[in-house]
Each structure stands twice: as structure tokens, then as C-alpha cells.
Curated annotation (Swiss-Prot):
Protein name per UniProt: Probable thymidylate kinase
Gene Ontology biological process terms, A to Z: dTDP biosynthetic process; dTTP biosynthetic process; dUDP biosynthetic process
Keyword Coiled coil in record: no
Gene Ontology CC terms, in alphabetical order: cytoplasm
Species in which this protein is naturally found: Methanococcus aeolicus (strain ATCC BAA-1280 / DSM 17508 / OCM 812 / Nankai-3)
């Protein structure tokens, strides 16, 4: 049976790189949130600095996820699906903006439970260094917010909110090459028997 694997972590942790590498390794399908659909494109504009009420942004993410889940379920029929960000990002980022976690959970109650969540941990300093190489910045990319984001992710994992079927894999990416992190991900997925 094909697996639904989610990557999470603060900006600059290596999520996108590692999700794409894993999708290639497994001959699976890479996907991300926000998606490239109509709603996802609107979300990207808001994240780029366009004004939007925080509740509206949370609802946009939930709406984008409805479309995304239909796509994921269809793709899982034939392939593994590797997702770069998912409902956990909504729980983290929207709660930091002051939205009640119960509201976030309520508007995302339809979300498919992943088989495993891979959390890529990175120091704030390394995250900022890696993001310094990027051409564009988003509204959540500064030291104070990154610290809050990391703490929220740890709370979600420790409290087992929206717990994946096979739990969590935590990997620190500080001072490791892309290849070293990729090998560690493969090993831990094999240890959990997610992949053979």
C-alpha cells in the first residue's frame, strides 16, 4: 500500500529539498502546500505581504487543503505521495497569529492522516543563514517568529496533535550535508517499515 509522507520544519530546515529527494528516491509524487492551484496562488500573494485577516488566511489554507487532499487520495492509488508542509503548518502558523487551535482543528477536520511526519529541525541561526540565500522573503521569516514556530512544532509533536499513523521522525539538519540528511531519512523510514 502506498504511503503518505509529510515533511515539516521551520523555514530553511531543508523540507523542500529533502521532500523532492525522497520523492525521486521512491519514484513517488512530490506535492506541497500551499498548492499551485487558484487558492494556493492567492495564499502565496498574502504570504508575500498582501493584507488579509488572519482568520481569512486560515480559511484559505483549509480551502486549499480540501482540493489538495482530493488530489493526494487520487495519486495514492498508484504512487507514494511526499508532501512539503501540511495541516501541521496551519496549526503552527495560524496559532502564532492568535487563532484558537480548536478553530484551526475544526476547519481542518477533513484532513487525511499521514502515515508519518518527518520533522526537520534546524537551529534558528542556520535557518536564517540558509534563507539569506533566497531571493524573496515571507511574512514569517524573522528570528523571533522562527523561535515561536519551532516551539509550536515541538508542542504539536509532544502533545501528539493530529498524530500520524506511524508517528514522527525527528532529524536535526545542522552541520549535515543534503546527502547525509537524505540517508538518515531513508534509514529511519526503513526502521519504521514505511519503506523497504
Amino acid at each position: 500500500m502506498n504511503k503518505f509522507i509529510v515533511f515539516e520544519g521551520i523555514d530553511g530546515s531543508g523540507k523542500t529539498t529533502q521532500a523532492k529527494l525522497l520523492a525521486d528516491y521512491l519514484n513517488g509524487i512530490y506535492t506541497c502546500e500551499p498548492t499551485n492551484g487558484e487558492i494556493g496562488q492567492l495564499i502565496r500573494k498574502v504570504l508575500g505581504g498582501k493584507n488579509c485577516e488572519k482568520e481569512s488566511l486560515a480559511l484559505l489554507f483549509a480551502g486549499d487543503r480540501v482540493e489538495h487532499i482530493k488530489e493526494i487520495e487520487h495519486k495514492l492509488i498508484e504512487n507514494m505521495v511526499i508532501c512539503d508542509r501540511y495541516v501541521y503548518s496551519s496549526m503552527v502558523y495560524q496559532s502564532i497569529q492568535g487563532i484558537d487551535i480548536d478553530f484551526i482543528a475544526s476547519i481542518n477536520r477533513f484532513a487525511k492522516i499521514p502515515d508519518v511526519l518527518i520533522y526537520l529541525d534546524v537551529s534558528i541561526e542556520e535557518s536564517l543563514k540558509r534563507m539569506g540565500d533566497r531571493d524573496s522573503k515571507e511574512i514569517f521569516e524573522n528570528k523571533e517568529i522562527l523561535q515561536k514556530v519551532n516551539k509550536k512544532y515541538m508542542n504539536i509533536i509532544n502533545e501528539r496533535l493530529f498524530e500520524p499513523k506511524n508517528g514522527y521522525i525527528l532529524i536535526n539538519t545542522d552541520n549535515k550535508t543534503v546527502e547525509e540528511v537524505h540517508k538518515e531519512i531513508i534509514k529511519k523510514l526503513m526502521d519504521k517499515k514505511i519503506i523497504l
